[in-house]
UniProtKB/Swiss-Prot annotation:
Family: Belongs to the UPF0284 family.
One term of GO molecular function: nicotinate-nucleotide-dimethylbenzimidazole phosphoribosyltransferase activity
Matches recorded under Gene3D superfamilies: 3.40.50.10210
Superkingdom of source: Archaea
Protein name, UniProt field: UPF0284 protein MK0224
Length: 378
């Protein structure tokens, strides 16, 4: 159940555990995670999906227009595989021209030689790259009814378990990212339905988080489905208000034989809430990695959100963009882009795998090289 006494705002103590990586939350558990995973092997999976919520005007900046958000997940992973887009309509970027955080993911998996796999949990546009199909579907606008059918939810959960088991046969830890435009709103809806305090807690892909739009849409959704905050368990809250990434990732965690690094920001809160409800929330086994832009975001509060759920470990990654020669990267420093495609967690995974040999300067240099290749092709 939500811990109301842990909902206060404010950034807690941060401790640098690796170059460019700081830990928050349970610092003792964080040190154990670093010790256990340092030098270990990993594979990164990016779970892609879509929700009709992303097409609500003003709710997501993960695309130049609301309609283009359906193309963003495919474009993100195509860029990581091929340095160009194929099935997507355009290079994923927000309306002010900042590049997709896929550039960070691409750079750090290159630097650390981390295998990268795409998992389709229900993307509207399928990517032109190899991917594992979990048989999902685009999440419905929860103001019009449950986001996912029982059949789809159950299939994503069970297939996720099988996948998690197979992916961790020969690695030391698993890294799981996501690309779901509109996902902070579905996450907010799930957490509200579970009874958590969510007002101004969730980050956004836009510079000025559209809290009023998100809160209005969530309120309309709960009213349409006759749900009061705290009415639902995690299963029903995710099925009725979530997106296809959520049951897929829960399943992957349950199937995993190793610790799991959740590469994402506030969108990972429903995953932690599900585990907490089942008595399975262990910060040494499941921990979160995100960018410093989420942790330091003045328009959201990931820490107070996670504190309500229970004990947690949160790693904050700095890609060094303040020193970039490209304006698009410096826009991250101004809050125009914060997270996506597992960017922050991917950097954490790279730092863990290499025992801290990859620094923010290395990340920035590789990001700029990747970005230049992308721009040469468009």
């Amino acid at each position: 159940m939500p811990n109301a006494n842990q909902a206060s705002a404010g950034v807690g103590a941060l401790k640098e555990v690796l170059p460019g990586i700081r830990a928050l939350g349970d610092l003792e558990a964080a040190e154990k995670v670093v010790k256990r995973c340092s030098g270990g092997s990993t594979v990164m999976v990016c779970v892609i999906g879509s929700t009709e919520i992303s097409r609500v005007p003003g709710i997501s900046a993960a695309g130049k227009t609301p309609e283009s958000t359906f193309h963003t997940p495919a474009g993100d992973v195509e860029l990581i595989y091929y340095d160009r887009i194929i099935n997507a309509e355009e290079v994923p970027q927000n309306p002010v021209g900042a590049p997709s955080p896929a550039v960070i993911t691409k750079a750090v998996v290159n630097l650390a030689s981390i295998p990268f796999l795409t998992v389709d949990a229900g993307a509207a546009v399928k990517p032109a790259c190899p991917y594992i199909d979990l048989g999902g579907e685009v999440a419905r606008d929860f103001r019009e009814g449950p986001a996912l059918s029982e059949e789809t939810y159950d299939r994503l959960l069970e297939f996720g378990k099988t996948l998690g088991k197979e992916l961790t046969r020969d690695v030391d830890f698993l890294t799981v990212g996501e690309s779901v435009p509109g996902g902070t709103t579905t996450a907010m809806a799930v957490m509200t339905a579970l009874g958590y305090e969510t007002s101004e807690k969730f980050a956004s892909s836009s510079h000025d988080s559209p809290h009023d739009i998100k809160e209005r849409v969530v309120k309309e959704g709960l009213e349409a489905q006759g749900v009061e905050p705290g009415d639902l368990d995690a299963h029903e809250a995710i099925r009725r208000f979530g997106d296809p990434m959520m049951p897929a990732v829960v399943g992957i965690i349950y199937g995993s034989r190793t610790p799991v690094l959740l590469a994402g920001g506030t969108q990972m809160a429903p995953i932690l809430a599900y585990l907490a409800e089942e008595g399975q929330l262990d910060p040494e086994r499941v921990f979160v990695g995100t960018t410093k832009y989420v942790v330091e975001d003045e328009d959201s509060d990931i820490e107070s959100l996670f504190r309500q759920v229970g004990d947690y470990v949160l790693f904050s990654a700095d890609p060094g963009f303040s020193e970039s020669k490209f304006r698009g990267f410096r826009l991250y420093e101004e809050g125009y882009v914060k997270e996506g495609v597992g960017a922050g967690g991917a950097q954490v995974a790279a730092a863990l795998k290499t025992k801290g040999e990859i620094t923010p300067k290395d990340v920035l240099r590789e990001c700029e090289r990747v970005y230049e290749r992308w721009m040469d092709k468009f």
